[in-house]
């Protein structure tokens, strides 16, 4: 799993049943990993996190081991997690509860984030990214050479 990297944006459309079609480049990587199930949960910035099952198990174990003062965040991540299968047409169903929490209606943006994905409402993603680009760069990035 450590060598698999999902990257790049994909503008997608939710169908009438709340499904997205997994882009071919990601579908091929998932198939090579033997992954046919994903886990979807809430992201603290108003989007959704989508994990291949092996990456989810690692994330889930890390979250579950957090101390009691993080119990609220455990509920956000673990209590909202839903397993979904990638269907024969390479579609992924996003549960209505999770679609509502992230404001997903039609136009969405799937971002490859290394070991997992983020799924954003397209307008919310554009606004969030614009705000990030206007904010000061955090100290942790100031040492990067661009």
Predicted ranges, named:
Residues 1-10, 16-17, 26-84, 88-89, ...:
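Flexible "stalk/tail and boundary" regions
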């Amino acid at each position: 799993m450590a060598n698999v990297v999902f990257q790049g944006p994909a503008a997608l459309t939710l169908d009438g049943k709340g499904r997205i079609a997994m882009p071919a480049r990601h579908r091929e990587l998932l198939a090579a990993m033997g992954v046919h199930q994903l886990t979807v949960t809430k992201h603290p910035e108003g989007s959704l996190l989508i994990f291949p099952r092996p990456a989810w198990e690692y994330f889930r174990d890390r979250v579950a081991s957090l101390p009691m003062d993080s119990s609220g965040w455990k509920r956000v991540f673990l209590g909202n997690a839903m397993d979904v299968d990638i269907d024969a047409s390479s579609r992924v169903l996003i549960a209505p509860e999770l679609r509502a929490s992230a404001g997903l209606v039609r136009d969405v943006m799937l971002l490859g984030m290394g070991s997992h994905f983020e799924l954003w409402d397209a307008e919310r993603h554009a606004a969030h990214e614009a705000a990030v680009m206007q904010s000061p760069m955090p100290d942790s990035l100031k040492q990067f050479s661009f």
